[in-house]
């Protein structure tokens, strides 16, 4: 591509350990980033912004600590720190073009940060600032990138996903309270089963979200252990022994999250099990959301030829050829997001295995998939809460009609007349399209008043064993 540009003024010459290289005149990056741009024209997708911002935090913390340790002149460190914080604030996202499919250590992205920050800092000081010797002082891509993944993933989960889940849970609980007295037909194997209330059905969804929140919070505890200071392979070569611990303290202050210096930095570089675990929690959440979304789709199906228990908010025309058709578009989007997150987890699982000896070499892929999953889940959870749960309506006439004809209500008579006799009643009620109460009156010795009590759907939602002349026990 660059050979097509005839105007040499559009380039400048940059130098790295491999020699000279032409770089676009206005680019903040240098030779190593340019080499990566030319080496990896693969997907057209650059590293996630959250990851780039985490690199900014790390470089700011490193400059501050290196100055405190007397390893970096304070005026230089001040400018590096300021430039790095600008990167962390997202002011230079466009200057991080390196493809996600790059060197497995993420060195190209680390050097992208080093070069951009060095350029910005030099503009302020007018003094030479080297991306390796100064910005990357006391660091290696091998400890910086795993640290950046953990920071960015933690920020994404705590800042977006967990609040979204809390919001969804609150909306589900609010609707459950409002619909608590409405009884509906339960279903197992997609077939009619015993009754339950909408509050009980919604409560199961809420419990799934509660469990997802708990699992995520538990996993985050392990993500808070940062391997910064391990440098190349975990030994801490070419860094001050106090650098890692001190830098992590600064990172905690910058992000507002209590991070810790990993006790075993070899693990933090060579193994990414905690990141695979986080991906697994995303996977489990995706499964839960897919279940909830599919329940909503089934309950909304129809409105005439399906279950038709609820009516979801009409958000857009559903068909380009069938007038008046409205589809459950948000639940469908939830299903697609869940499918993608499950796919991401497969990629992260394979990537987690791809570390030989002292370094995992699929770190950019892990970073991309984790942060993409967190973003997708956080966004779609909010939509599910605000565009579906809040506005759904129960079609009580339809729910009551189906409930009254549900032959499975006869299950409550098992302790009194036996399973086989109850089955006869259920089959006859279904075959003759009659309420089970009518058929039970004809097929049993129980009087209608007693049968009405025993087959009361509301009472059946409370469980227990029902006997003649008494309630559930």
Swiss-Prot record:
Record's GO cellular component terms: cytoplasm
Main localization (coarse): cytoplasm
SUPFAM superfamilies assigned to the protein according to its UniProt record, in alphabetical order: L-aspartase-like
Site (Important for catalytic activity): 332
A GO biological process held by the record: tricarboxylic acid cycle
Pathway noted in the entry: Carbohydrate metabolism; tricarboxylic acid cycle; (S)-malate from fumarate: step 1/1
HAMAP family in alphabetical order: FumaraseC (MF_00743)
Family: Belongs to the class-II fumarase/aspartase family. Fumarase subfamily.
Protein name: Fumarate hydratase class II
Organism in which the protein naturally occurs: Xylella fastidiosa (strain 9a5c)
Higher taxonomy: Bacteria, Pseudomonadati, Pseudomonadota, Gammaproteobacteria, Lysobacterales
């Amino acid at each position: 591509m660059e050979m097509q540009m005839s105007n040499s003024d559009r380039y400048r010459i940059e130098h790295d350990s491999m020699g000279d290289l032409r770089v676009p005149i206005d680019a903040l990056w240098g030779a190593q980033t340019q080499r990566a741009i030319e080496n990896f024209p693969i997907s057209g997708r650059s590293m996630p912004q959250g990851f780039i911002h985490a690199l900014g935090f790390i470089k700011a913390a490193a400059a501050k600590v290196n100055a405190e340790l007397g390893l970096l002149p304070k005026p230089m460190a001040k400018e590096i720190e300021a430039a790095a914080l600008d990167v962390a604030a997202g002011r230079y996202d466009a200057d991080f073009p390196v493809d996600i499919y790059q060197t497995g250590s993420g060195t190209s992205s680390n050097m992208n940060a080093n070069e951009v920050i060095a350029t910005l800092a030099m503009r302020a000081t007018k003094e030479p600032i080297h991306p390796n010797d100064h910005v990357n002082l006391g660091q290696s891509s091998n400890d910086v990138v795993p640290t950046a993944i953990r920071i960015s993933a933690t920020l994404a989960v705590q800042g977006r996903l967990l609040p979204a889940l809390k919001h969804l849970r609150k909306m589900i609980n609010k609707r459950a309270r409002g619909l608590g007295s409405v009884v509906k037909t339960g279903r197992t194997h997609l077939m009619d089963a015993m009754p339950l209330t909408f509050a009980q059905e919604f409560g199961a969804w809420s419990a799934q979200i509660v469990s997802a929140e708990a699992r995520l919070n538990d996993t985050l505890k392990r993500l808070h252990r940062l391997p910064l200071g391990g440098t190349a392979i975990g030994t801490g070569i070419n860094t001050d022994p106090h650098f890692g611990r001190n830098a992590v303290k600064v990172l905690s202050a910058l992000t507002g999250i209590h991070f810790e210096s990993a006790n075993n930095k070899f693990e933090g570089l060579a193994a990414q099990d905690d990141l695979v675990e986080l991906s697994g929690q995303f996977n489990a959440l995706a499964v839960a959301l897919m279940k909830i979304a599919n329940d909503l789709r089934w309950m909304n199906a129809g409105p005439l030829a399906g279950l038709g228990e609820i009516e979801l908010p009409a958000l857009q025309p559903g068909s380009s050829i069938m007038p008046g058709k409205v589809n459950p578009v948000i639940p469908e989007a939830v299903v697609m997001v869940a499918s993608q997150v499950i796919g991401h987890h497969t990629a992260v699982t394979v990537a987690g295995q791809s570390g030989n000896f002292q370094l995992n070499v699929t770190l950019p892929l892990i970073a991309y998939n984790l942060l993409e999953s967190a973003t997708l889940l956080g966004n779609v959870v909010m939509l599910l809460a605000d565009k579906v749960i809040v506005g759904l309506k129960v079609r009580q006439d339809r729910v009551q009609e189906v409930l009254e004809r549900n032959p499975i209500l006869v299950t409550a008579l098992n302790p009194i007349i036996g399973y086989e006799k109850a089955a006869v009643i259920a089959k006859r009620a279904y075959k003759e399209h009659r309420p089970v109460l009518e058929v039970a009156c004809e097929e049993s010795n129980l009087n209608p008043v007693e049968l009405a009590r025993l087959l009361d759907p509301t009472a059946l939602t409370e469980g227990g064993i029902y006997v003649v002349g008494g309630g559930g026990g």
